[in-house]
UniProtKB/Swiss-Prot annotation:
Binding-site residues for Fe cation, renumbered to this chain: 178, 180, 314
Reactions that this protein is recorded to catalyse: L-lysine + 2-oxoglutarate + O2 = (3S)-3-hydroxy-L-lysine + succinate + CO2
Gene3D superfamilies linked: Clavaminate synthase-like
Record lineage: Bacteria, Bacillati, Actinomycetota, Actinomycetes, Catenulisporales
GO molecular function: 2-oxoglutarate-dependent dioxygenase activity; iron ion binding
Keyword tags: Dioxygenase, Iron, Metal-binding, Oxidoreductase
EC number of the protein: 1.14.11.-
Protein name, entry field: L-lysine 3-hydroxylase
Family: Belongs to the clavaminate synthase family.
Organism: Catenulispora acidiphila (strain DSM 44928 / JCM 14897 / NBRC 102108 / NRRL B-24433 / ID139908)
Coiled coil spans: none
Entry keyword annotation includes Mitochondrion: no
Amino acid sequence: MKNLSAYEVYESPKTSGESRTEAVSEAAFESDPEVSAILVLTSSEASTLERVADLVTAHALYAAHDFCAQAQLAAAELPSRVVARLQEFAWGDMNEGHLLIKGLPQVRSLPPTPTSNVHAVAATTPMSRYQALINECVGRMIAYEAEGHGHTFQDMVPSAMSAHSQTSLGSAVELELHTEQAFSPLRPDFVSLACLRGDPRALTYLFSARQLVATLTTQEIAMLREPMWTTTVDESFLAEGRTFLLGFERGPIPILSGADDDPFIVFDQDLMRGISAPAQELQQTVIRAYYAERVSHCLAPGEMLLIDNRRAVHGRSIFAPRFDGADRFLSRSFIVADGSRSRHARSSFGRVVSARFS
């Protein structure tokens, strides 16, 4: 496993006034293939981002469409170098499935880390505007009624009640490799993670379809392009007894698709099952390749990670939250390249995909 980050230790205040040791990741990919996957903002670019964010005045939670539309317009004011790099990533031909952005303005007066994802705390911070401006350079922001309460920005925080779950609220078990919403034809094209508070033990794992293909035989690649796997709906979508137009079990579907030199991947270690013994064994081959070749990064405050949900899978390590108000706190949002693909599942001028269409 390659590690994308080096660490330096610093002391950050607890909400109680005590101190706690955390780690900050520095801009240091350890091998050349990942170097192009980092965008480091200069101090001038960060200042411009902070200034442009003031143009976004709508409420991120209660006026989500207006908020996103304002961010789309304001994004034209961002530095051309930043916009060009984000658009290059969005186009995708040369991306490795992720882009790490460093040097975002630090959020002052950050509220305590919430203990659940109910209250959309991240949406009330300046980070939501920074994140939206960057997101809207890549595509159009979208939300899902059945995921994170339909919030445009979801609080990714550890929950004591969900510590052992295969969801973003877990911490006591490794979050296994997955495509975000692998089961849904309306899944996001990109996942956006902005760090408000970090944890040195919480690593985000990344593994691209290109990395996978490089480990496989021609026969294995051909098999992965056949519809030989089923998947079920994610646990986080099943609250409130929801039903779905496509049912609970989906497929069979292929794991790989797209161009030979730019493959797409759909995978979920927890939810996918092969329809035959060879398919099940090949699924295990994919998992073994992930553990051997994945890269990792420890997100720190002022960093944002964009994941191309078509070209890469991701996961997260085990970590040990204290539930003291100073735990890991990420803001997650979703982006699509083409908003019209989900228009039938959203209300007029709405940004939220209705649960039954997921």
